[in-house]
A protein has these predicted regions:
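Hydrophobic anchor residue at the start of the ABC signature
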Residues: 129
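A short, proline-enriched helix->beta-strand linker immediately N-terminal to the Walker B motif
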Residues: 134-138
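Conserved ABC ATPase "signature" region
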Residues: 94-111
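Helix-to-loop junction immediately C-terminal to a conserved catalytic motif
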Residues: 49
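ABC-family nucleotide-binding domains
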Residues: 143, 150
């Protein structure tokens, strides 16, 4: 089932963040959400994940979904290793070989046994990405997931994201044109207005 956003609006106090936004996220397809900083991309993500509710309008097709997500701020267990953080969300059927392939794909092979608190910001982002990709979900939402990664690692990571989300609904937020091109999205939602 497609996810349908129907004339939603959202304000925080006097600050209007989204106004009368409508869009569709097709089932099993990749959608890129683009827009400048502060235009409401993250607010839309919070509404899709049911972490907040719109002031007006409605969102259909989210109530029975299994979501996994990469947030702008990572939500990792500081004292656990990168591997343990990833295994927390994996099904028991995931193999060591699949995990090894994942570490290689996003260049984490040297640090997967280290506690997350010892990792750089870019490494932490990649741990968050693997958690979202390897969790049991049918819709993956990523809010600026490649922020802080160098260009070579970004390109390699996007290839792995596309491989692991094939057949799933992927909603990918970026403000960088290059990432939007690399993503080869089936659909693009541009949020143009900053209130």
């Amino acid at each position: 089932m497609d996810i349908k956003v129907d004339h939603i609006s959202k304000a925080y106090g006097e600050q209007q963040v989204l106004q009368d936004l409508s869009c569709v996220f097709p089932e099993g397809k990749t959608t890129c959400i683009r827009g400048r900083s502060g235009c409401g991309k993250t607010t839309l993500i919070r509404l899709l994940l049911r972490l907040d509710v719109p002031d007006k309008g409605k969102i259909e097709g989210i109530s029975d979904r299994k979501f996994s997500a990469v947030f702008q701020e990572d939500r990792l267990c500081e004292n656990l290793s990168a591997a343990s953080n990833i295994r927390l969300v994996c099904t028991e059927t995931i193999t060591d070989r699949e995990l090894e392939e994942a570490y290689i794909a996003v260049a984490l092979t040297e640090v997967w046994q280290k506690p997350v608190r010892e990792l750089s910001g870019g490494m932490r982002r990649r741990v968050s990405i693997l958690r979202a990709l390897l969790a049991e979900s049918d819709c993956v939402i990523m809010d600026e997931p490649l922020r802080g990664l160098d260009e070579k690692t970004r390109a390699k990571t996007i290839d792995y994201i596309l491989k692991k989300t094939e057949g799933k609904t992927l909603i990918f937020v970026t403000h960088e044109e290059k990432e939007a091109v690399w993503l080869r999205a089936d659909r693009t939602v541009d949020i143009l207005t900053k209130y």
